[in-house]
């Protein structure tokens, strides 16, 4: 028996199957969305400090309102001193 035959035989399972498929699709799409973000580290051996490569001018949040980035001179001095 196929899945559709079971659903047609037991019509009370149709909403359950619908919500399970919507939840699975949402979970999969969120996982793919999260893996595309720059703060996710999959391979730590080739890139041990990925936060150094983040472009500060590119917004990392879903929505940014009036975000203006300016480098902090003290932090730049510390970064240069630790290299």
Curated annotation (Swiss-Prot):
Disulfide bonds: none annotated. One of its GO terms (cellular component) is mitochondrion. The keyword Ribonucleoprotein does not apply. Transmembrane segments: none annotated. Strongly expressed in vertebrae, brain, intestine and stomach. It is found in: Nucleus. Pfam families: B12D. It comes from the Eukaryota. Keywords: Nucleus. One of its GO terms (biological process) is response to bacterium. InterPro entries: B12D. Belongs to the complex I NDUFA4 subunit family. This is Normal mucosa of esophagus-specific gene 1 protein. The lineage of its organism: Eukaryota, Metazoa, Chordata, Craniata, Vertebrata. The gene is Nmes1.
């Amino acid at each position: 028996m196929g899945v559709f035959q079971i659903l047609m035989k037991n019509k009370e399972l149709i909403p359950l199957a619908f919500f399970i498929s919507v939840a699975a699709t949402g979970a999969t799409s969120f996982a793919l969305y999260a893996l595309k973000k720059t703060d996710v580290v999959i391979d730590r051996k080739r890139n041990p400090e990925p936060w150094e490569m983040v472009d500060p001018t590119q917004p990392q949040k879903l929505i940014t309102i009036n975000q203006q980035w300016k480098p902090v001179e003290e932090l730049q001095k510390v970064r240069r001193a630790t290299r």
